[in-house]
From Swiss-Prot:
Protein keywords: Activator, Cell junction, Cytoplasm, Developmental protein, Membrane, Nucleus, Repeat, Transcription, Transcription regulation, Wnt signaling pathway
Source species: Caenorhabditis briggsae
InterPro entries: ARM-like, ARM-type_fold, Armadillo, Beta-catenin
Signal sequence range: none
Protein name, entry field: Beta-catenin/armadillo-related protein 1
Role summary: Participates in the Wnt signaling pathway which affects cell fate and may regulate the stem cell divisions of seam cells during larval development. Functions as a transcriptional activator but is dependent on the interaction with pop-1. Involved in maintaining lin-39 Hox expression and regulating glr-1 abundance at the synapses. Required for mab-5 expression during Q neuroblast migration and for oxidative stress-induced daf-16 signaling.
GO-annotated molecular function: alpha-catenin binding; cadherin binding; nuclear receptor binding; protein phosphatase binding; transcription coactivator activity
Region Disordered, residue ranges: 702-808
Location of the protein in the cell: Cytoplasm; Nucleus; Membrane; Cell junction
GO cellular component annotations of the record: adherens junction; catenin complex; cell junction; cytoplasm; nucleus
UniProt KW Cytoplasm keyword: yes
Amino acid sequence: MDLDPNLVINHDDTNLSEISYTMEQDSSSYSLEMGGTPSSAGHRKVDMWQNHNFDSGFQTMNHSEAPSIISSLHPSSHLSGMSSMAEYEPIPNLSEQQKQKFDGITKNPTDGQYNTVRAIPELTMLMKDQDNEVVQKAVMIMQNIAKMECDAMRRQNETKIVDPCVIFTLRNLLRDKVDHPNIIRFTLGTLFNICNRQEGIDLVTRAISEQPDIIPNLIRHIGTFANSIYKYAILTMHSILSDKQRGGQSVTIARQQDAIIHVTPWLEAEKSEKLLPVIVDLIRVLCEKNTDQKVKFVKMGGPQKLLHILQQRGYENLLWRSTQLLKTFSNFDAPCLVAFGGRQILAGMLSHGSPRLVLSTLETLRNISDVPSKMKEELLLKSLLELVNSRNAVIRLYSAQTMSNLVANNRPNKEYMCSNNGVVNLCRALAIATKDWQNFQDKEAQQMEDYAESLICTLRHLCVGHPLAEKVQAYVFREPSIFLHKLMTMRPVLLKHTLNLLLKVVSQNALLAPFLLCRIGEIGFVEQLIHILRVACTQLNVQDVIEGVRVKDIVHLCIQILRLITRNPDILNEVDFFLRSPENSRMGDGHTLPIFVLQKANVEENTKSSTLELIYNLMHHEKMADHLERDEILCKMLHSVQMQAANHPELANLAANILKLMSEKRERNRIHYGRHGSFESQFGHLSVAAQRTEVLNSHGETYEGAGEQWSQPMSDDSMMESYCNSSGRDSSKTYNSPMYHSPPSMYPEYPNGPPSGPYYDPHAFTSTRPTPPHYANYDSPPVYNNIPSNQGPSSHLSDQYPYRQGRF
């Protein structure tokens, strides 16, 4: 390929302000849909260039003939090139002496054009000439060669600029020709075009390893406004630093030279919406995984400048890159972003038509949503309520997680959610997620589990801390089988949040009826709660944490719920039935679950306090009271706790109350037995506690640890088998949850998925399980349909819950 020496670029300073820089989208069709690309002025002399046999591409940017390859080389920048409004004129006549210096460049005898292969060494020498006009022409021709080589349609098979001496010479020009802006501009343009191909990047980075001062000279010109030199310097710097293979050394040098201090001011000063994305991405590269650079950026007001860009600009690519950079600082200095109104500004981005912009915005919002703020956030909450049912799984997940953080410990946000159908939307979303759960596998199932977890957590926050809390609890528990299903999945994180929500719900007497009546198959809440408690107890001495959830927390929540629900006589009967079942009454040395919990030294004091309150409630059941009274270990522990009143007054008081109940019961029995003979004559055939222990020991069985030695049915009931592997706790590992690969079901006779039948059976069961009380007329309490802005059950299909094969 040959060059026409009769053309030169004559840049007019009045047109330099119109130079634009194109940041290509991921796909051309997406750019057309968004319609956000700022218009650029037309080229006035395209027709003239079409009549010449060479087009450098620098001025016309004729993409239809010469598509850029920078997108494939630097996917992070997607920079297609530079355009200019420069005029093209014949080269001004050089003096004869100046022309003679170019006579040494070899020409082809056929067409009289310069031969690029042989011209490069000559041009390299001419760029060292003392005559600045000669240097300018030489570097201009070198720039045209570099532009031709980065053009896939114009370059020859063999790369021509391969000599590091070319880079060193360009470096010298950047250092020595500071007073000649045209030379500097052509030099930077040459470097930029060389960096537009991978071979050129390798050449430049090798030169930098030999002469590191190339980077400082580039940084020096970032602050040069004349002839828009700073634009060329920023583009060239970005091309070098964004190379993923060899850019690391250059990034280190740039950080040492405080490049970020020179680049950051242009976020505010630059007007071009196409150069700003390059500046933002350059800052991202400099700040990536470097705390010092982030601190400098924050001190210079960088986050505020980015938020200002989001408010004032409309170019989608610029907005997306700005949110990507803000996402980095959301994990570094979240309070700073919130203090400058970051949540309110980012909320405006959620209605944008770009999915990647919405997703990036949501991720940033999620990272700063846990920061307390007194600012109004109605717009943000409204947008999140719309996105929580999005078809995009990641968008709805981030929306739910952000919403959960916003309503936690924030009364105004809770009241807004309750008065704007927030509870209704969340319950509907949870019902849909529960219905669709069994249709997903692996990664999709993991996302669905995280989504359900966030919804339950949000509902739990809405159940307390505001005047409408009781009404919300009643509305949330209209379909109790959803939460029973979550308990039956035995997923640690879901268990924790579901148990927390149930702890709020069962505080209402009106909600104990659906709690008792709800069934999936034959499994009810009480049986499942006791099963979870038993499985957790077996792991107290084995492992403290399972997938981020403390086993102690599961034990404490189960005890708390059992303590609250046993105030109901019907539920107390059911609790007694399951606690005295063989698998639950032979924990450790043959004790029931509450006594086993009291024995564990690693259980916290608040858990022991709740356990004593549960035992106190159980003492009001005749059969369970007999069972507890015969346990000598329990009596010894109660006396021991009572004697430690100075250190644990609350526990001592509870122990004293239980011992008082036991004493009163013995007194009643003594009076009763006195009428009909001695206790031994009436019940002499029964074994007392000591005899029972001797019988157990006579079989040679030992009861140590957490009951894991029981052959039936405890031997196969380890935590890791019963608690399925929860989702997303270690993103570095492949998600392979046993829940989604058909593990042995906890209850083989019942399906794992949501049932198709009604959620409770008004008729008596034929099994040996306790029969729930029959309610002749069971209606929802009036508060169910009294949520603000909820006009009660709607007859319109779109306002009802999704259709199911019957209720759970």
